[in-house]
From Swiss-Prot:
Its EC number is 6.3.5.-. Allows the formation of correctly charged Asn-tRNA(Asn) or Gln-tRNA(Gln) through the transamidation of misacylated Asp-tRNA(Asn) or Glu-tRNA(Gln) in organisms which lack either or both of asparaginyl-tRNA or glutaminyl-tRNA synthetases. The reaction takes place in the presence of glutamine and ATP through an activated phospho-Asp-tRNA(Asn) or phospho-Glu-tRNA(Gln). InterPro entries: Asn/Gln-tRNA_amidoTrfase_suB/E (IPR017959), Asn/Gln-tRNA_Trfase_suB/E_cat (IPR006075), Asn/Gln_amidotransferase (IPR018027), Asn/Gln_tRNA_amidoTrase-B-like (IPR003789), GatB (IPR004413), GatB_C_1 (IPR042114), GatB_Yqey_C_2 (IPR023168), Gln-tRNA_amidoTrfase_suB_CS (IPR017958). Belongs to the GatB/GatE family. GatB subfamily. It comes from Neisseria meningitidis serogroup C (strain 053442). Keywords: ATP-binding, Ligase, Nucleotide-binding, Protein biosynthesis. The lineage of its organism: Bacteria, Pseudomonadati, Pseudomonadota, Betaproteobacteria, Neisseriales. It holds the Pfam family GatB_Yqey. This is Aspartyl/glutamyl-tRNA(Asn/Gln) amidotransferase subunit B. Gene3D superfamilies: 1.10.10.410, GatB domain, N-terminal subdomain. It catalyses: L-glutamyl-tRNA(Gln) + L-glutamine + ATP + H2O = L-glutaminyl-tRNA(Gln) + L-glutamate + ADP + phosphate + H(+); L-aspartyl-tRNA(Asn) + L-glutamine + ATP + H2O = L-asparaginyl-tRNA(Asn) + L-glutamate + ADP + phosphate + 2 H(+). The gene is gatB. The keyword Transmembrane does not apply.
Amino acid sequence: MTWETVIGLEIHVQLNTKSKIFSGASTAFGAEPNAHASVVECALPGVLPVMNREVVEKAIKLGLALDAKINQKNVFDRKNYFYPDLPKGYQISQLDLPIVEHGKLEIVVGDDVKTINVTRAHMEEDAGKSVHEGLNSATGIDLNRAGTPLLEVVSEPEMHSAAEAVAYAKALHSLVTWLDICDGNMAEGSFRVDANVSVRPKGQAEFGTRREIKNLNSFRFLEQAINYEVEAQIEILEDGGKVQQATMLFDPEKGETRVMRLKEDAQDYRYFPDPDLLPVIISDAQMQKAKAEMPELPKEMAARFVADYGVSDYDARLLTASRAQAAYFEEAAKESGQGKPTANWMNGELAAALNKAGLELADSPITAPRLAALVGKIADGTLSSKLAKKAFEAMWAEPEATIAEIIEKHGLQQMTDTGAVEAIVDEVLANNAKAVEQFKSGNEKALNAIVGQVMKASKGKANPAQVQELIKAKLA
């Protein structure tokens, strides 16, 4: 039997506000346990929540970026459950009236572009966490994270492979960091993914029983967990068993999922409207202000890069993976006047060097003006492609040196003396009679071999295009 995988993702996006969603306590990461737990998070008698305006503003931003419906009346609900890291005994969330509904997000998987519908994004508070280490078999409660503002972004179950799920998660991660509503730090829990996974016979309309894999904090773990879970469910079904709805944990060391608890449904949480919070009304004026303050979005900027700088669609997508990368490219391309070559260097040598050194673009020793200077020297004929790579390596190692200093110090200037180049060409032709005869017989590959010999003899300083013209003229 052929099986079809069905995946929906619920992603918790931690908003980068300085204070919590319902109190003035700090959201800073890494403090001593409970240093940022106010009376609201501790649920002391008589305390009341006060809504953080910035949370609403950031949620609106995401809704606009997802081309979604934004509900201007927002009601909060209590999600009731007992857990030690939730002193109130309930979590404040949104059930029936989320701030964002019916959005969409475009993903790219290989050469395919696909749109995934976003069901909703709702505001809620995070819970605290239990601490087990260093407490002599006891369990401690750290409420620093409690009350941190979250947007839970829920997709439609429209992904059919781990690759699509990872592409969706990466696209949303890129979008929320682009909008500057989340720092995107997965290691610190700023972007956590829950994957709802089920399988069904190919062609069947009805969904299979889903299992939810909780708190995946890396794209690699997301891919591994989904692939394992799909195989596990198929094995159960092919052995004649039934998949039981459950909440799963992923063990990255073993590379497998395991049951955490039998899955609860919405009715198990006994949702009801929170009587301590008035409805939040977003005015038309606030909506207009939010629209006016929206930055240029990645898709729009990518289209502009294609139109203005002549880069390919593929390069444009890479260049708009982050605002920092897009800004770097635009600065370098404007300064050099060379859009496509700038994109090639950024997506090629620069990306490889950053990856090898484990550096972010912001820490690159080759700044946008320095890359523009390098590309400019290639465009004006000072550097050949081969010499430019040597210049790039020298610029990386000598961050204070100008391109002119690099060229002079390392003797990288391309040969401009036509007579000297012609002399090398004559010598190579005289010493490569076989290749010459092959070219004259119509073998174009022989020309490349002769050009290669000239470049070798000139130590890469001859202009390949000029060399090719000279060879063709002499052998005509």
